[in-house]
Amino acid sequence: MKKIYLLAVALAGTLLTSCSDFLDKVPLVVPSSETFLTNQSAVTNYVNGLYIALPSAGAYGMGIMGEEKNSDNMVAMVYDRRMNGELQESIGGVTEWQKGYQNLRSVNYFLEYYKVPAAEETAEVLSLKGEAYFFRAYWHYYLLTKFGSIPVMDKFWDGNATVGGLQIPARDRSAVAQFILDDLKAAKELLYSRSKYQGLRICKEAAMVMAMRVALFEGTWEKYHKGTDFAAAEYKSDDFLQQVLTLGDELFQMGITLNTKENDKSVKNIDDAYGNLFNSKDLSATQEVLFWKKYSIADNLVHSLNTNLSSGMCDAEGPAGLSQSLVDNYLSCLLYTSPS
């Protein structure tokens, strides 16, 4: 009888030890944050997923054309709550506020757990890391243009973060803009040039143009809102506008050429060369186009832009149309370039 008890105790001890060893193992299916982003394949897959949130001509909406809604160029049937002073962070649904910070969390997860060994940090891996910095700048800029002064998300907040710990004060809009420009500078130092992927991935030149756009936006905002309730706490308009000029000079020294009739052998005049920037199916050889998306039925990358244009649909909120001032501008241009 004692032998049976001893055998039972020994067996129980073995099982407990085995269970303990098994529980110490990393799950085979669920990736570990500590070991996930440690090689080029994992880094590539993760960064590829960040592209999905960028504006494009999907099943609904006009992609980047829809960004013109409620500008001087397009008038929407549904008025812009931001322009009317009604935009709030807490309105139901996936708001602009939620969209921006949800995407920032995804980017910051990558930057927090990126742990590729230095010996394996090839130019390809470093360029992917540069893309992540571009995405973080992009989503901060998205929020800046809609809300002005915002909390900057410069680190990843995991599931253990407390509510109190997430009460991050907003930074002045000028400081937010500079943070964005610093991220784009970091991206520029790591990214490949356009020639590597023919503009199908974020590149060094695209980061520079994005930085110019951010600096121009903030520089002109501070210039024309000086002395108003919307002014930045620290006036840095001249500094931002100077950055636009500096980046522009550097960009053209990198050999970027404009699409003119001399560079585009498929056209006979400058009007057609300009038109090819917007009506070509393949822009890989058009150096002026720094970042674009190639649609392909074979790859199931499709859109409904033609249908939306014919129906006037701009996005899920409804239709939008060209403003009279935009049409007048084009008519004036045609009269100038073709007097006959």
Task: Report each predicted region and the residues it spans.
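An aromatic- and glycine-enriched ligand-binding surface/loop that stacks and positions planar moieties
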Residues: 20-79, 150, 154, 185-186, ...
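Short, conserved phosphate-binding/catalytic loop or strand-edge motifs used
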Residues: 155-161
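Sec-dependent N-terminal signal peptides
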Residues: 6-12
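Conserved, well-structured interaction surfaces
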Residues: 41-56, 77-147, 163-199
